[in-house]
Every structure is written in structure tokens, then in C-alpha cells.
Amino acid sequence: MPFEKSKKILIALDYDDQQAALDFVKQLSPDSCRLKVGKEMFTYFGPAFVKELIDLGFDVFLDLKFHDIPNTVAKAVTAAAKMGVWMVNVHASGGFEMMSKAKQALAPFGDKAPLLIAVTVLTSMDETELKRLGVEKTPQEQVIYLAKLAKEAGLDGVVCSAQEAQQLKAELGAGFKLVTPGIRPVGSDAGDQKRIMTPKQAIDAGSDYLVIGRPITQADNPVAVLADVNKSIE
């Protein structure tokens, strides 16, 4: 169904000017995409900005990648749920107990609870960078390992590159959501993402949600680019 397909795009808002962000967002329809707010914007503008986006009708992915002791992370995801966000994430490398307690903290919110997603391996990390951290696995092996841990802890899915999506779907099941950054529409610059695919390639590989930032936010006609992306994955 095209509507469901169109809601697979999560636009990464990376602005240091709140009005510029709102001017951009107001060009979009909540039926055509969801929005991702990360550390930069949240640090600048805080929960009030997130609530404003929600009031405009958008589902918001609060991308703060919580990573702390279990009690602190549980309180943080509770605060995110009270804010009304659609999705929130934590670092899988925080461990099983941290992830499990975060999921338990969302239980009282019932069907209003945000999806809880784990970050596995950042898309800017390659094998060389992992080795510098003392991890001897390849990026793909580490993603699979951490994704299995996240599922065991009860999480709803993971952030992963499209290259891992097919294997993750096969091993962890269709209901385990895969959120994929590093997506570049055909003809876009790769930027600082080392593991990239086009939207259609990522969906075909098994990704459920695609994070796209600069190729849309910095486009001359962002609405047209978004429409093209949505059409490409119908």
C-alpha cells in the first residue's frame, strides 16, 4: 500500500536554526514521511521543539542513542515516551540489562509506547575502526551479534546498514524492525557514510525504515525529492 510505503522515510533534521528547521518541515506532509531529531537539534532546542513537530502531526524518532547505567537509561526512555515520540534508541553495546530495563520501563505506556530500537554499529565504522576499539569482528559480524542481543532483551528492532538487513531479517524474523541510515537517492554524494545503498536497494534487502538527511533537507526542491524516493519504493 503506497501510504504505508511512504511512511518508511525518516527525514533527519540536522539544523542549528530552529526557524529554518520549522520552515523546512512545514513544506512536508506528515503522510509522506516521519522525522528524526538527533543530538545536535535536541541539545539546541530541547523537548519543546520535539513537541512542536508532534503537534504538527509528525511521528518523531528521537535519535539520542542512550548509553548509560540501566536505571539512567530506563528513566531517559520514560521521559521520551512522556514526550510522545514514536521511536527512541539506545546503544546495544550498553548491554543486555540496560536494554531490558529500558524496554520494561516502557510497558506502562501500552500501545502509546515508542518503538525501542538499538544502535548496533555506526555506519561510519569500518573494520579498521572496530579494530581500534578492540573489536575483532567485522562490522557485519558485530551487527548480527548485537542485534541478537537486542532481540533477546525484548527490543523492537535495530539500526543497521542495508548490507546487514537481509541476514538480520532471515535470522531475527520479519517483525524485528530494521532502521537503515546511510541511504542516498541515486545521484547523491556519499558524504561521511561508508556503507550506503539507494532507497529501493535497502527496502528490497529488508530494511523497514530509511533515514535520509541532506539529500532531502539540502535539495532545491525537497518535496519533489521526497516524492521521488517514495515512488521508488512503492
UniProtKB/Swiss-Prot annotation:
Q: What is this protein called?
A: Orotidine 5'-phosphate decarboxylase
Gene name linked to the record: pyrF
* Disulfide bonds, paired cysteine numbers: none
Q: How does it associate, per the subunit comment?
A: Homodimer.
**CDD domains xref list:** OMP_decarboxylase_like (cd04725)
Record PANTHER family? OROTIDINE 5'-PHOSPHATE DECARBOXYLASE
Does the keyword Oxidoreductase feature in the UniProt annotation?
A: no
Q: What does this protein do?
A: Catalyzes the decarboxylation of orotidine 5'-monophosphate (OMP) to uridine 5'-monophosphate (UMP).
User: Which keywords has UniProt assigned to this entry?
Assistant: Decarboxylase, Lyase, Pyrimidine biosynthesis
